[in-house]
Amino acid sequence: MAADISISGSSEMVLDMGNSATADDSSLASETDININFSNTSDSGISTSMNYGIDEGGANDDMIVTISGDFGSLSYTNAGDDHALNGGDIDPAGTAEERAPAAADMHANTYTGGLPGIGDNHVTFTLPSLVDGLTLAGSLSNGTGTTATTGEAASYRVTFDAGVARIVYGEVRAATQTDTHVGVSVPLGGATIQIAQNSNDETGVDNSATLIGVQYAVSDALTLGMEMDKGENGTAAQDYDMTSIGA
């Protein structure tokens, strides 16, 4: 049986108003992506798919292979940020492209709320639905380093979709640090409101970030968005604050 092939793309222009504790970092940014997806379903009901993404710089992005059936789904990828939690967290992305303040304008301990990857090659397993609306997924990577992105690491995600709201809880666990995420997404007609609280137990700091995003679908081809992020680590002079507006 021949595979079905679909090609999709998107582009966004964003005004970022990021403020570090010491500088005004407002700037324009853009995000353009192309996705090519190959899919097939066997006579036995096993489905396979491969997604190949290309970002605006021409680099490989979102390369994921998935096998699914009554047993759930198993996927592998070479993208470290496509693990179980990062692939299904409440990411208040009112805009697709946000520009954080320049590294030189932020303290080394400034926390922006980002979740780490778990290695460029990892596997993810999603259990079949046991209760309507409930999804459980986990990822595992194995490397020789000591951080989540270079060494042994795992992530998991618990999602409950009640229709009127979607709630997500999950963690990224590595040898020396655990990152925690809790988020909720609420659809309101053509609008969607997303709120997330991210934190970790990095030694010597108290990292916590609140991320809020609002999207409104004007039409099938146009979506407006706004995002507001605030990160803290226990020291006011190292706080992070970013607002972005995009279409």
Residue ranges and their predicted role:
Residues 1-247:
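Outer-membrane beta-barrel proteins
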